[in-house]
From Swiss-Prot:
L-aspartate binds at E174, R220, H457, R498. Keywords: Aminoacyl-tRNA synthetase, ATP-binding, Cytoplasm, Ligase, Nucleotide-binding, Protein biosynthesis. This is Aspartate--tRNA(Asp/Asn) ligase. It comes from the Bacteria. The keyword Protein biosynthesis applies. GO terms for molecular function: aspartate-tRNA ligase activity; aspartate-tRNA(Asn) ligase activity; ATP binding; nucleic acid binding. Gene3D superfamilies: Bira Bifunctional Protein, Domain 2, GAD-like domain, Nucleic acid-binding proteins. It comes from Burkholderia mallei (strain SAVP1). It catalyses: tRNA(Asx) + L-aspartate + ATP = L-aspartyl-tRNA(Asx) + AMP + diphosphate. Belongs to the class-II aminoacyl-tRNA synthetase family. Type 1 subfamily. ATP binds at R220, D221, E222, Q229, E491, G543, L544, D545, R546. Homodimer. The record marks H32, G83 as: Important for tRNA non-discrimination.
Amino acid sequence: MSMRTEYCGLVTEHLLGQTVSLCGWVHRRRDHGGVIFIDLRDREGLVQVVCDPDRAEMFAAAEGVRNEFCIQVKGLVRGRPEGTINAGLKSGRIEVLCHELNVLNASVTPPFQLDDDNLSETTRLTHRVLDLRRPQMQHNLRLRYRVAIEARKYLDEQGFIDIETPMLTKSTPEGARDYLVPSRVNAGQFFALPQSPQLFKQLLMVANFDRYYQITKCFRDEDLRADRQPEFTQIDCETSFLGEQEIRDLFEDMIRHIFKTTIGVELDATFPVMPYSEAMARFGSDKPDLRVKLEFTELTDAMKDVDFKVFSTPANTKDGRVAALRVPKGGELTRGDIDGYTEFVRIYGAKGLAWIKVNERAKGRDGLQSPIVKNLHDASIAAILERTGAQDGDIIFFAADRAKVVNDSLGALRLKIGHSEFGKANGLVEAGWKPLWVVDFPMFEYDDEEARYVAAHHPFTSPKDEHLEYLETDPGRCLAKAYDMVLNGWEIGGGSVRIHREEVQSKVFRALKIGPEEAQAKFGFLLDALQYGAPPHGGIAFGLDRIVTMMAGADSIRDVIAFPKTQRAQCLLTQAPSPVDERQLRELHIRLRQPEQPKA
């Protein structure tokens, strides 16, 4: 008989009366009146093994096993006695009567129980091998595998070719920091790990591969958050001779296919499309969570002439904004709730949080409860009530500052209230999945520190055809042929139509204050390739980690990556990064400089 004939979790009634050989880990061992029960676990689940004392050698071995011992069991599959069936297990109607038990490897006492749900992340990541044995982690990583398989199936059916691009490439520091790799052979020179395969996939389109994809690692040396890692995985795609709408349709179908085949979710037949300007106006975010039924009301123009300087000053400032957020039935929020929200928005740079409770709208000013009403004239109050559509029992929150602060703070408040217990109880948030496309992004953003425009996405995104003239006259007016797929407030994919003409690419570089010499030094290979009949092309990249995190309902992408880094970009399992010896540094022509000590 083979070492293993079945997986533990797949032993069911169809094997009744058969002898099986199982391998796995002792999940739990129980001694009940001379009979030993072992819950044996493998990647497919659990099965109950019964060890009778009739077989002395086997029973002695069973007495010695403990949690996480790796064992082999041979035995007879039989039905469980009446009253002992476990409906919560796939194998819950049967058990295996053990004939032979072999300890393949003993285990020291684990630092935690695998069913302990209150472990710190530090403990879990330090002992990641044991953490990965937990059923939830097994589920998450197998879900990740299925998502990748379904993406490959779809792309293969659509004629895409899986082509690998280099991991050691050229540093082009436009955006996040590169991870640099010193060259031993070329002293003083460095490779960079790719932030994306962007330029190589464009070159593959010029090279006539027409449709490319790969599921690949990318690297960015940036500060980490719950949805960030220094190395992450993209489903990276590029295609020739398709327009923006056709590209969106193609990959919208892919995401629908993946969700249906992996978790049985039918996403909308057509994803709504929202311009960037509308998303910012209504939600203060370019990745709006459409499950939350709260929206901004624009008040900037109505607050220009009020005596209340908190509102009028930003209303009359070039980059200022005044916006309101009406919360239906929010009148029942306590002063403690409001104070908590006030502290919350300070995280996003807001100086405070103005509010008005609408007790009886018909009474006008007298029907309102607020510390700011006395500072507003009747026309302003009427405009606020009219524009927000406020009803009796509502509360209206206000933000007035630079537009970025208003968008960030009021946008975060919108999500916090919507997803709160209050929001759920009052129907302010829907369950389910709410995808959309956000389009027509600004081509450039102005960087005050550098006193120049920078690319909002990357410098290879094509401007809209009707905005080409602005590249040389008014870059700030340029909109891009860029598109992001957003799902429940997360950007899961982003892409664009690319620039395929060398003269347009050179104009974009000039708009970014990248001169001809610098452009040739950094991107000469691309500019040269674009001169050889480069086809119109575009593409998209999806964050595999993010998609699986959402599907699994996980708290962090670290829960869907086998060996992730911490928020300090460290691997607690291997203790990477770590020092290297002097000989290695000499071979790489590197001398370390001691970090400066803080002054006393």
